[in-house]
Amino acid sequence: IDAGKHILMLNVETDITIGLYLAQQAKEKGVVYSVANGDEPVACKELYDFSVDIGFEVVCIGKGKNNPLDQTATPESLHDRAMQKNMNPKMLASFVDGSKTMIEMTALSNGIGMPLDKVGMNGPVSEVSDLNRNLIPESDGGVLKESGRVDFAFGPAPGVFSIVTTDNPTIIEEMAYLSMGEGPYYTLYRPYHLASVEAPRSVGMAIINNEPGLQPTTWISEVIGHAKKDLKPGDQIDGIGGFSSYGVAYPYSETDGLAPLGLIEGAKVVGEVKQGEPIPRASLELPDNLINKLRNKQNN
């Protein structure tokens, strides 16, 4: 950024830790900082923009998750499955323990300014055909406390979805004619994200259009580290998808005193934390590394 170069971030973990600072720095330097196309956050953002552009109110935006949740998963416990999939066991562990979904939906939340419904989100089990019955407000039989939320569902992976509504009679009539349902809630679903195949689109967007695909516009959500096992003084925290921690998405307003997942790799444990509990900052001695220094700048 300081050299006047556009930055297309393939590491979403970095975005949910210091992305707001990077976006601000890029704006000052007249360059683009963006999460790269290809993964669910940008795919969701594109579907969100599409939904709004054609006149809908977005009730819920999110992604499908296909791996059963196991917040105790480690590279060791998943080694054989990872080898079968030709994957890095640590990466697979970050999917199975839920960290990756929490990270991706936090990036989306901060990028579009739409909050999470609650700590950890709802994550109902749902077929695509039932998304517009599940991810809607409780008052209409769904799981959301309120409309306008970021969430996810077990089942409709690897796609992304936008649950929308409208009071426009012309759109309602046309949606019925197009066999999209009688409303009041409709599901717009994109059944894929194409990873590195899509990533080059980010280059064109940055260089030709001078636009980001997704960047933080606010900081309303945070991924907090939780203990994957009992942590004791003297332990050292390893990285995302490791043996000691996993991530849970929080409304930022509920994170006082808690340690963001992206800051704790290499931290020394100085206070006990029970398995499954959020990790307090006071229980860690954070490393004096670049990511923590940049986060301090973001906080200030």
Give residue ranges: language-model regions.
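Anion (oxyanion) recognition and catalysis
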Residues: 1-2, 27, 52, 110
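Rossmann-fold NAD(P)-binding glycine/threonine-rich loop
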Residues: 2-3, 10-32
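Loop/helix-junction capping segments adjacent to catalytic residues or to phosphate/diphosphate-binding pockets
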Residues: 9, 16-17, 41, 109, ...
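General beta-strand structural signal in soluble alpha/beta enzymes
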Residues: 9-10, 33-37, 58-62, 118-120, ...
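Short, ordered loop/turn segments at secondary-structure junctions
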Residues: 11-15, 38-39, 63-66, 242, ...
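Aromatic/hydrophobic pocket-lining residues that form π-stacking "cages" and hydrophobic walls in ligand
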Residues: 22, 47, 105
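Rossmann-like NAD(P)H-binding beta-loop-alpha module
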Residues: 26-30, 34-100
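C-terminal catalytic/substrate-binding lobe primarily of soluble NAD(P)-dependent oxidoreductases
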Residues: 80-300
